[in-house]
Curated annotation (Swiss-Prot), chains A, B:
Chain's role: Catalyzes the interconversion of 2-phosphoglycerate and 3-phosphoglycerate.
EC assignment: 5.4.2.12
Gene: apgM
Lineage: Archaea, Methanobacteriati, Methanobacteriota, Methanomada group, Methanococci
Organism name: Methanococcus maripaludis (strain DSM 14266 / JCM 13030 / NBRC 101832 / S2 / LL)
Protein family per UniProt: Belongs to the BPG-independent phosphoglycerate mutase family. A-PGAM subfamily.
PANTHER family noted in UniProt: COFACTOR-INDEPENDENT PHOSPHOGLYCERATE MUTASE, METALLOENZYME DOMAIN-CONTAINING PROTEIN
Biological process, per Gene Ontology: glycolytic process
Catalytic reactions of this protein: (2R)-2-phosphoglycerate = (2R)-3-phosphoglycerate
NCBIfam families xrefs: apgM (TIGR00306), PRK04024.1 (NF003104)
Designated name of the protein: 2,3-bisphosphoglycerate-independent phosphoglycerate mutase
Domain of life the protein comes from: Archaea
Pathway named in the protein's UniProt entry: Carbohydrate degradation; glycolysis; pyruvate from D-glyceraldehyde 3-phosphate: step 3/5
Entries under InterPro entries matching the protein: Alkaline_phosphatase_core_sf, ApgAM_prokaryotes, Metalloenzyme, Pglycerate_mutase_ApgM
Entry keyword set: Glycolysis, Isomerase
GO molecular function, one term: metal ion binding
Length: 406, 406
C-alpha cells in the first residue's frame, strides 16, 4: 500500500451572508465522490482554535509535533533553498536591504534587486571566530543565512526594523546563556562585515550609477536552531517524496528527508501546471510509497479576498483529482484530501476554522457523507481530528503501525 | 467584534426514566433559535470524564489550563472577597468555629454568627516571624486568610476536622521542603494566637451571655499558592468584565483581571434579578469587549434534586436570552451559551456529563441542529470540545488569534 496526503493550501472558509463558501459552491464532483466513497471529518492541522502557519501545519500533517520540531521559519527556509543544514545550526531568513551609513533602512528589499549571486559570494564561507557562515541567496533580494559552530543558540532577537526609516536592529541575547550572548555577537559582527563588503561592491557601484537602491546590508529574521528531526523513512518505513511549489514547504520536506520532486510540465493535458502536478503525482507513485502534495492557489486567492478565484482554483484541483483517481488504484493507494489551514475570504489570512478532510482507500469505514465541504464532512466517521493524527491513521491502515503493548 | 460567554451554572443533566431532562423539557424558544442560527456541540469544561468544580470550569472557559493555574480554592475565594493577592501568597478559606479549651469543635460555623468584623480586626495585619497575616471576613462565619512572606509553600495539610466533636487538626507539611515546614509552623502558631485573641473577645463574651456559640477559633482549608496568571487583557487583547453572583466566580474573574460588575436591579422589566442581569449584560457590552456571565439557580436546583425548579430556572434564562439577543447585534457580538458542568437531579452534585454548547454570531458555520439540549447539540459542527477551546475559537473568529508559524 502507498499513501498520498494532498493539501489544498488555505482550503477552508467561513460562510458568506448566504451561507456559502468557495468550496461549498464550487463544482467538485470528484471531491464529492471521494467523500461518498471515503471516511470524512474535520481537521485542525495543529489544534482546535490554533491559527497555523503553513510550516507548522505541514509538519503536523507529516506526523511531527510542531511544538517540539518547529523552532522558527529560518531552518525550513534555509533547507528549502538548498542549504544542507545540520542539527544545532542557527538559521535565518534574510533580506538584502538598502541602508545609509548609519544603518537606517532606506529600502527593505533593495529595490527588489534580481540577481544577488555575486553578493552572496562575499558572505558565504566567511568565518567569524569559530563560527562558519553559510549564506545563500534564494532569488532576488531574499537569502538564507546559517551559522555553524560550537555553543550557539537561537535565543536572540532579530535585526529587522520592519519599517523603512528605522535602523537595522542590533541583535540581543534573549536569555543569560553564554551561547545566546556569543550568537548575538557573531551576528552583530557579521552585519558590520556585510556592510563593509557589500557597500562598495561593484554590483552596488553599478546600481548607484543607475540610480537603483543598493543591496548593501543583510537583515536576518525568523531565527531558529535546526532541530534534531527523525527522518521520515526511519519513522514510518516509507520512501517519501514531496511535490510542492513553495520553498517553505520544500524546506520542510527536505528537513524530514522527503525527496522534493520538481514539476516542470507534463503531457497529461495542456491545461496549466495543475495538470502537470497531477501527472507528476501519478508518476512519482511508481517509485515512492508516500507523497506529500501541496497545491497553492486557493490560499493566495483567500489572502487576496477573491472568492471567485478561490472557487475556480478548487474546481481546477477537482480536475487534478479526476486524473489522479482514474490513474491510481484504490486497492493500492490511500488518499487523504484536506488543507493545511483555512484562509477565509473575509479574513484574508489564515484562520483556525477546521478543514474538511476525507480519507479514501481500501477498507476505510465509509460513512454517510456525500459532499466534500465545511458543512457536510463534520458528520463523518473521522469526527474532529488533528493533523498529527493523519500519519498514524495511514500507517495503521497500511499495516505499518507499531503495536503499543503486547 | 465583542464576545459573551454565558454560563448557566449546572446546566446539563442525565435523562430521567422517561428520557427527559429539565433542559429538554423546558420551553426555550430562544435557546432553540440560537442553536438553529449557530454552531452547536458538546463541551466538557475541563475534560471528558472529569467532574469539575465551578472554579476549575470557569478558569478553563476563560482559556486558562486549570491544571497549571488552579492551585486550590483559597486563592480564588480570597480574591473574590476583595483581598489583593500576589503571586506566591498562600491563601485559605476559613470558617469561624466554636471550640472548647482542647480545640474540640463544638460548632463548625460558630452558630452561623452574622457579624465578625470586630473579630477580623484581631487577626488582620498580624505578623508571625517574617510572615504577614491578611485576614478578611466574607460575610458571617466565613473568611479568607492569606499568608504573605518569603519561603512559603501550599504543600501542607488543612485544619478542618470536617465534623463536630473532633479536634481542629494540627497542620503538617506534605513534603520535605523547608518552605512547607515553615508554612505549617506559621499556621499552627496563628491558630493558637487566634484562640487566645478570640476566646475572651468582648464579642464572644457577649455571645456567651446570650447562650450563643462563640466564634473563638478559625479553621482554614482549601489552601493554595496564588499562581502567576497572565492577565486576560494581556493574553487576549480584550477589555473584559464579569457578571456573576457568587464570590468564587468573582474571585476567578478578579484573579485574571476582569472587572467585576455588580448588578443591583435595572429597569428593563420588573421580573426578578434574572432580567436585571440581562440588562446589565447589554449595558456592559457598550464599554467592554468581553463578558463572562454566570447565572446560578439551575445548579442550586440540581444540588437540591429539584427537577421542576431547574426547569423553571432554565425558562427564566431563556427570557434573559430573549432580551439580550434582541438588544445586541449578531454582526457585532459572538455569543457562547453553555454551562460550567452538569448538576444532574439524580446525582444532586456536579457530574462530568458534557454540556450542550452553541456558538452564535457572524460567519460561524451554521449546522443542522435545531434544538438546544443534551440530545441534539452533539450532532452539531462543534463536535465535542473542551472548555479551553472556547476562547481560542472566539479569538480566531474575532481576528485576534496569533499565527503559529509562518
Amino acid at each position: 500500500m502507498k499513501a498520498v496526503i494532498f493539501v489544498v493550501d488555505g482550503l477552508g472558509d467561513r460562510p458568506d451572508k448566504n451561507g456559502n463558501t468557495p468550496l461549498k459552491e464550487a463544482k467538485t464532483p470528484v471531491m464529492d465522490r471521494m467523500a461518498k466513497e471515503g471516511i470524512c471529518g474535520l481537521m485542525n492541522s495543529v489544534d482546535i482554535g490554533v491559527r497555523p502557519g503553513s510550516d507548522t501545519a505541514h509538519l503536523a500533517l507529516l506526523g511531527y509535533d510542531p511544538y517540539t520540531t518547529y523552532t522558527g521559519r529560518g531552518p525550513f527556509e534555509a533547507c528549502g533553498v538548498g542549504v544542507t543544514v545540520k542539527p544545532g545550526d542557527i538559521a535565518f531568513r534574510c533580506n538584502f536591504s538598502s541602508v545609509d551609513e548609519n544603518f537606517i533602512v532606506t529600502d527593505r528589499r533593495a529595490g527588489r534587486i534580481e540577481n544577488t549571486s555575486e553578493l552572496e559570494k562575499e558572505l558565504d564561507g566567511l568565518k567569524i571566530d569559530d563560527v562558519e557562515i553559510i549564506f545563500k541567496e534564494s532569488g532576488g533580494y531574499r537569502a538564507a543565512l546559517v551559522l555553524r559552530g560550537p555553543g550557539l543558540s537561537d535565543k536572540i532577537t532579530d535585526a529587522d526594523p520592519k519599517k523603512e526609516g528605522k535602523k537595522v536592529k542590533e541583535i540581543h541575547p534573549l536569555d543569560d546563556s553564554k551561547e545566546a550572548k556569543k550568537t548575538a555577537e557573531i551576528v552583530n559582527k557579521l552585519l558590520k562585515i556585510a556592510y563593509e563588503k557589500l557597500d562598495k561592491h561593484p554590483v552596488n557601484e553599478e546600481r548607484r550609477k543607475q540610480n537603483l537602491p543598493v543591496a548593501n546590508m543583510i537583515v536576518p529574521r525568523g531565527v531558529g536552531q535546526v532541530p534534531e528531526i527523525m527522518q521520515f523513512t526511519e519513522k514510518t518505513g516509507l520512501k517519501g517524496a514531496c511535490i510542492a511549489g513553495t520553498g517553505l514547504i520544500k524546506g520542510i520536506a527536505k528537513m524530514v528527508g522527503l525527496d522534493v520532486i520538481d514539476v516542470e510540465g507534463c503531457d497529461g493535458t495542456p491545461d496549466s501546471d495543475f495538470m502537470a502536478k497531477a501527472c507528476a503525482i501519478v508518476e512519482t507513485l511508481e517509485n515512492y510509497d508516500f507523497i506529500l502534495v501541496n497545491v497553492k492557489g486557493a490560499d493566495e486567492a483567500g489572502h487576496d479576498g477573491n472568492y471567485e478565484l478561490k472557487k475556480q482554483v478548487i474546481e481546477k484541483v477537482d480536475e487534478m483529482l479526476d486524473y489522479i483517481t482514474k490513474n491510481i488504484s484504490k486497492d493500492e493507494v490511500y488518499f487523504v484530501l484536506s488543507g493545511d489551514h483555512s484562509t477565509p475570504i473575509e479574513e484574508m489570512d489564515h484562520s483556525a476554522d477546521p478543514l474538511p478532510v476525507v480519507l479514501w482507500g481500501k477498507s476505510v469505514r465509509v460513512d454517510d457523507v456525500e459532499k466534500f465541504d465545511e458543512f457536510s464532512t463534520y458528520k463523518g466517521g473521522l469526527n474532529w481530528i488533528k493533523g498529527v493524527h493523519i500519519m498514524p491513521i495511514l500507517l495503521d491502515l497500511m499495516g505499518l503501525a507499531k503495536k503499543y503493548g503486547a
